[in-house]
Each structure stands twice: as structure tokens, then as C-alpha cells.
Amino acid sequence: MSRSIKKGPFADASLLKKVDAQADADKKQVIKTWSRRSTIFPSFVGLTIAVYDGRKHVPVYITEDMVGHKLGEFVPTRTFHGHKSTDDKATSQS
């Protein structure tokens, strides 16, 4: 279910403040955030935002194609270790 149109997109206030401060500054720095639920706005394009995945902050470079998506979509929280491999003994006995 998508968000209601009348509510508009959501972005954390602290993240917006950091993005606005970054736009005023000349140096580009990585912005750390824990707000995976924030929607990416056009003003974020060209910035690098480090999104928390539960263990560490993963840097994500924002492009125009990402506008309208959530920050959490680009940083997976679960690591896939692969399926359990079969033993050689189990396959050779059958």
C-alpha cells in the first residue's frame, strides 16, 4: 500500500537540515543518517548519504533515478550467506 497523495512525501527533519547545510557549504561530505524511511527528494541528487543497515553506515550516491524512492531500498539489511551445500558423503551413498 502506498502513501496517501494528500499527505505528501516524508523526509526526516534532521536529514533535511543536514542536506540544506550541505547545499550551502562548498565541501561535499558524507551525510550519516539512520532514517531509512525518508523519501529521496530532488535536492538530494549529487550527494552521498551514509544509510545505516543495522551494523554500519553504507554510503549511497544519490542519482536522478533514485528520486521518489526510500533511502532504505538501496541498502539491504540482511546478508545472504548462501544455501547449505550438500555433503559429498550424502550424494555418493545414494
From Swiss-Prot:
The gene is rpsS. Protein S19 forms a complex with S13 that binds strongly to the 16S ribosomal RNA. The keyword RNA-binding applies. The keyword Nucleotidyltransferase does not apply. Coiled coil: none annotated. This is Small ribosomal subunit protein uS19. GO terms for cellular component: cytoplasm; small ribosomal subunit. PANTHER family: RIBOSOMAL PROTEIN S19P FAMILY MEMBER, SMALL RIBOSOMAL SUBUNIT PROTEIN US19M. Disulfide bonds: none annotated. GO terms for molecular function: rRNA binding; structural constituent of ribosome. InterPro entries: Ribosomal_uS19, Ribosomal_uS19_bac-type, Ribosomal_uS19_CS, Ribosomal_uS19_SF. One of its GO terms (biological process) is translation. Belongs to the universal ribosomal protein uS19 family. Keywords: Ribonucleoprotein, Ribosomal protein, RNA-binding, rRNA-binding.
